[in-house]
Amino acid sequence: MDQNKQKALAAALGQIEKQFGKGSIMRLGDSKTMDIEAISTGSLSLDVALGIGGLPCGRIVEIYGPESSGKTTLTLQVIAEAQKKGKTCAFVDAEHALDPIYAAKLGVNVDDLLISQPDTGEQALEICDMLVRSNAVDVIIVDSVAALTPKAEIEGEMGDSHVGLQARLMSQALRKLTANIKNANCLCIFINQIRMKIGVMFGSPETTTGGNALKFYASVRLDIRRIGAIKEGDEVVGNETRVKVVKNKVAPPFKQAEFQIFYGAGISKEGELVDLGVKHKLIDKAGAWYSYNGEKIGQGKANVMKLFAENKAMAGEVEARLRELLLSGAVPVDDKAAPVEAEEFDAESEQEFE
């Protein structure tokens, strides 16, 4: 670049910084925030699938799936992990269905958790925006997008048509929220539900509620599904769960993770440590016996899980070694999920009015 251009650029950059504040424009190489801070999901395999060790701070995340698939459980685990780091968390409960006893069982400090149960969608998103702009809240959960009912719909009659109202509300709110979330380095998670599009002949008929805006603004989108039941005898005690990283702007997408969720206890970390330890040869398996560092640690997966639950030091050591191995880029991350088919935009069934 010649000298005149350099002088002109320096003058322009100086003027921009003077008018809009320091840091309003910078060279990417000068930025000290190249590494994205992440908050663990409570699942080691999902942290690995996300590529950065968890969900990214300063970004919007969408978690969606069918009913009883583990969406709220996963977000409560994120809150528990964030609170362990001393972070402040808020839960905007638009569904009015949060169970504090269950949250406490998952490790959430319910005494310190901020909770709001708003009356309307506008109120919920306004509260969310005020919390973000305070720069004092690190994690915000909105449960769920489908329950963010516009004020006009609540005040109207039961059968009234309100086409595109919720989509317009979400689009406007996300335009305001995105920059504030980045500046506050706050993780904002929207839980969403699934609906079926009518008349779809090819591809998946499933779509999420609230228009298309959230799909664009979200840096990470997670599709969570229940793929089986965990039984003790005839009694069902938990779910086998699969999470697909459908969209990821901070690492390669389309990875997937599988883990167990036990009723009343949440994600089984011990089960993940056993499975990943065996897969990556940190734990040796010969027949039904498992060995670690040359010593037998148990017969059968259930006994090893019990040992890890009791011996936190050993479990912590295995987890630390797995994180170092899997998140350094030395080993390929979990299996790839099948790429998600692009959804055709149907102007009639899902309009986003601005």
UniProtKB/Swiss-Prot annotation:
Query: Would I find Endoplasmic reticulum among this entry's keywords?
Result: no
| Residues annotated for ATP binding in this entry | G65, P66, E67, S68, S69, G70, K71, T72
List this protein's GO terms for biological process. Answer: DNA recombination; DNA repair; SOS response
The GO cellular component terms are: cytosol
Where, subcellularly, is it found?
Cytoplasm
| InterPro entries the UniProt entry points to | AAA+_ATPase, DNA_recomb/repair_RecA, DNA_recomb/repair_RecA_CS, P-loop_NTPase, RecA-like_C, RecA-like_N, RecA_ATP-bd, RecA_C_sf
Q: Name one GO molecular function term.
A: ATP-dependent DNA damage sensor activity
Q: Which Pfam families match?
A: RecA, RecA_C
Protein family membership: Belongs to the RecA family.
Q: What does this protein do?
A: Can catalyze the hydrolysis of ATP in the presence of single-stranded DNA, the ATP-dependent uptake of single-stranded DNA by duplex DNA, and the ATP-dependent hybridization of homologous single-stranded DNAs. It interacts with LexA causing its activation and leading to its autocatalytic cleavage.
Q: Know the name of this protein?
A: Protein RecA
Q: Which organism is it from?
A: Aeromonas hydrophila subsp. hydrophila (strain ATCC 7966 / DSM 30187 / BCRC 13018 / CCUG 14551 / JCM 1027 / KCTC 2358 / NCIMB 9240 / NCTC 8049)
Q: What is the lineage of its organism?
A: Bacteria, Pseudomonadati, Pseudomonadota, Gammaproteobacteria, Aeromonadales
